[in-house]
Amino acid sequence: LATGLAVFGTLALTQPTLAQTATATDGPKIGLELNKLESIEGGCRAYVVFRNPTEVEYDAFNLELLVFGAGGVIEKRLAVPVSPLRPNKTTVNLFDMTSVSCDDVGEVLLNGFFECTSGGQAVEACVDRVELSSKAKARFYK
């Protein structure tokens, strides 16, 4: 009986820890949608819709993107700062790609994050927390 209680007590104590270590794939994903590419003088402007259905506010959500031309060659590497990313909120961010024609953009790769923090603390596996889509002619993927 004493052994049974000790095991039960150990399980009860570890249960909150298991809940706290839920993986980034659990729960709702942050949606990133490449909505539109617009030609501008000297380049291309991208409109990205961010949908954060979670209760988490991100102080920094800074993307590393690689832009591939229609032939599959990397045209541009971009650091896109998105700060803050508020909980339960949809926002649109624009970023300009100089010296890149919108017609030449074939794919945009979310290669990773330069910085991903919440409450001043680094957030693990930010790439796993997002779901990508595109309404533009270019593919948006990770």
Across the structure, where does each feature detected by a protein language model lie?
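Short acidic/proline- and small/hydrophobic-mixed sequence motifs that coincide with surface turns
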Residues: 57-60
